[in-house]
Amino acid sequence: MTIHKKGQAHWEGDIKRGKGTVSTESGVLNQQPYGFNTRFEGEKGTNPEELIGAAHAACFSMALSLMLGEAGFTPTSIDTTADVSLDKVDAGFAITKIALKSEVAVPGIDASTFDGIIQKAKAGCPVSQVLKAEITLDYQLKS
């Protein structure tokens, strides 16, 4: 079974003065503004890197919940941040690293079991699998 989800972008103009909007099939994002100014100058709006970060954090959290459940554990909370690094390389830019940081509360799990599961979630998350950048993971098991 293949599931298809769609994101859409509209762009007008050159790279510095142009502007665009991004939308999602679900409507959660509906013509949200983005542009050079929101990506590089801190203006209000979104940018591709924060959208990738949000998608990666969400995917990782769900993968971790699934794998914990398969091992007989139910997390009470998973809070994940994905810090996406965009660096100047050669003549352009590249996402060079994504640092996942996750704080997780799981009753009854020991640190060794948790470490094995969270590392599998990092590798098994579909978004992790599609990204070429180095993906790091920092986590804290909350008691």
Swiss-Prot record:
Superkingdom field: Bacteria
Gene Ontology biological-process entries: hyperosmotic response; response to hydroperoxide; response to oxidative stress
Annotated region described as Disordered, given as residue ranges: 1-27
MF (Gene Ontology): peroxidase activity; peroxiredoxin activity; protein homodimerization activity
Class of enzymatic activity (EC top level): oxidoreductase
One Gene Ontology cellular component annotation held by this UniProt entry: cytosol
Reaction it catalyzes: a hydroperoxide + [protein]-dithiol = [protein]-disulfide + an alcohol + H2O
Subcellular location field: Cytoplasm
Residues where N6-acetyllysine is found: 16
Family: Belongs to the OsmC/Ohr family.
PANTHER family the UniProt entry points to: OSMOTICALLY INDUCIBLE FAMILY PROTEIN
Entry protein name: Peroxiredoxin OsmC
Name of the gene this protein is made from: osmC
